[in-house]
């Protein structure tokens, strides 16, 4: 069968369901597809089709993720759902499936639980910009006052983690009832609530700025000099656009950022006018010697990113079964940090009261590198030892 053409007429947005185990994330995902399928905007995916998620590799980690596609009247969505708690943690930290917004599923009879709190903290740390709440299993709650108390508790949890808890939409649903009914009508007591939830997602989760609108960034992968022409740096454009004549900052590793000019761009030995995100390009640079630039540095829009040696990070430590360490590590552990294209030696500083980190843990820590690296909030990295990945991290705050 011929592949369908990707429809670009609706703006695209990435969302995911998050929340405590057994609060109904996967059932809700199934209910969303069932309801939208009545309009022809989704293929219905049953619970067990979503739950046996295929495994993916990201930064040396195996993560089980289900990718579901659906549309509403105004948007096209890619929706991710993970079967296990650890899969969510790993996905958020590695950014394997980036989320522009999250649907936080909280079971009304139970209220926020430990994993609810952990997920909310993490989406704040890795900069998921917006959240909509699905208060699930409302068919099991007769007491309106109790429902209001649970809603208040969820709002307080969001506020505590720097989200606007008072204004975030909280929609009361019963995923199982909507699935059982399946009529998909807006006036239906249960299917109508799924529509209400999707309306909230449509209006409250913003369409992300396209990478072309963000400040230019390219991590340098290789460098060579062309006799009589100058120095060429190659890499993949991560965000923003660049054209011949633009000034960029060369950031990281040994000295303060310095300004250089991109004289021309090439891709597959052809001259380019402009390069966009995803393009693997060679940039011909003026005002820089071959010796002054190396793999691991970045070229960026002037002033947009700075080199740092200290940062705070959220880190997931691989378990032994995932190919990680067999033993814990302690304060002062000195691994390699892999930022984009290079390994930098550094040191780990554990929070007060944390003696050691055991494989399989998710922990907040401070890291310091032996020389400055271009870092910014939300940036992902791997922790390596002896050439193998032992952890994955995301910068939650740059310090100095």
Swiss-Prot record:
The record, for InterPro entries, names:
EF-Tu_GTP-bd (IPR041709), EF-Tu_GTPase (IPR050055), EFTu-like_2 (IPR004161), EFTU_2 (IPR033720), P-loop_NTPase (IPR027417), Small_GTP-bd (IPR005225), T_Tr_GTP-bd_dom (IPR000795), Transl_B-barrel_sf (IPR009000)
Q: Disulfide connectivity?
A: none
* Catalytic activity, EC: 3.6.5.3
Region labeled G4 — which residues? 136-139
Function field: GTP hydrolase that promotes the GTP-dependent binding of aminoacyl-tRNA to the A-site of ribosomes during protein biosynthesis.
* Family recorded in the similarity comment: Belongs to the TRAFAC class translation factor GTPase superfamily. Classic translation factor GTPase family. EF-Tu/EF-1A subfamily.
Q: What is this protein called?
A: Elongation factor Tu
| Compartments, record wording | Cytoplasm
An example GO CC term for this entry is: cytosol
UniProt catalytic activity: GTP + H2O = GDP + phosphate + H(+)
PROSITE patterns xrefs:
G_TR_2
Q: Where does Mg(2+) bind?
A: 26
Sequence segments annotated as region (G1): 19-26
Region annotation G2: residue ranges? 60-64
tr-type G domain residues: 10-210
Q: Region G5: list its residue ranges.
A: 174-176
G3: region residues: 81-84
Q: What is its main location?
A: cytoplasm
Q: Which organism was this protein described from?
A: Dehalococcoides mccartyi (strain ATCC BAA-2100 / JCM 16839 / KCTC 5957 / BAV1)
What keyword terms does UniProt attach to this protein? Cytoplasm, Elongation factor, GTP-binding, Hydrolase, Magnesium, Metal-binding, Nucleotide-binding, Protein biosynthesis
